[in-house]
């Protein structure tokens, strides 16, 4: 049976995660187009929902759970010239609302698995 070919452009978190997830399907041949040189370190952090965290654990082999910081509480603020205003709060006793991680660490794992 001939495999369907898929091309993914971009080596950001979404492109890498998509490439890895699709590469696990035997009927697909996945190609990733990315930059040849990395000129900067990605020191950003990303937050994902509990469902996305579960998906990461499904797709990435032996994912180190210590790379993720679970959060059961979220407070959102906006800043004016003279004050900080809290405009939204989420608080959950039993389950995590989101998981925060450093982009570089997860991207390095994804590059190794692809």
Which stretches of residues belong to each language-model region?
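Phosphate-coordination loops involved in phosphoryl transfer and adenosine-cofactor binding
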Residues: 3
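Glycine-rich FAD pyrophosphate-binding loop
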Residues: 7-11, 20-44
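N-terminal Rossmann-fold NAD(P) dinucleotide-binding loop
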Residues: 15-16
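Short, glycine/charged-enriched secondary-structure capping and boundary segments
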Residues: 22, 45-48, 90-91
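N-terminal FAD cofactor-binding segment of flavoenzymes
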Residues: 41-79
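Conserved N-terminal helical subregion
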Residues: 69-114
């Amino acid at each position: 049976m001939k495999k369907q070919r898929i091309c993914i452009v971009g080596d950001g978190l979404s492109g890498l995660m998509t490439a890895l997830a699709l590469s696990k399907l035997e009927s697909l041949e996945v190609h990733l187009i990315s930059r040849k040189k990395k000129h900067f370190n990605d020191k950003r952090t990303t937050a994902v929902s509990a469902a996305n965290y579960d998906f990461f654990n499904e797709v990435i082999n032996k994912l180190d759970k210590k790379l993720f910081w679970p959060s059961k509480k979220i407070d959102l603020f906006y800043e004016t010239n003279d004050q900080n205003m809290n405009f939204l709060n989420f608080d959950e006793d039993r389950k995590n609302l989101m998981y925060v991680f450093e982009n570089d660490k997860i991207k390095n794992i994804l590059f190794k698995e692809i």
